[in-house]
Amino acid sequence: MHKILLIMESLIQFEVVFMQEASEFLKDLQPQARKKIYYNIAKVANGLKDSDLFKKTDGASDLWEFRTLYDGIQYRLLAFWDEQEKRLVVATHGFVKKTWKIPKKEIVRAEALRKKYYESK
């Protein structure tokens, strides 16, 4: 896992860590898309309340999504709040969203990665 460096440490509302799958997804993106995703995550982590950038997923228990639109492409990173560390959000993995709803397989994958995270703590 790796952490994202946030702009103003004293204003951080929560910290974000990336599981390996999320890191690999980001690493494989074009640099400008990756930069925009990090920028949007930092804005939300520093206190911006914007459901266009970070919102609870519909119909999924306790999963959230970081949302970025860049160059006409919808990028998503699914995440959850760590139950012990109340100010920690864990990004499980990312994908390019092609449909209105989040595909069920992505929800299942995020839930499996969340389980793996807690088992390794």
Which functions belong to the PLM regions below?
Residues M1-Q74, E83-L88, V96-K121:
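Basic, Lys/Arg-enriched alpha-helical interface segments
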Residues T92:
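Conserved catalytic cores of phosphodiester-cleaving nucleases, focusing on short active-site segments
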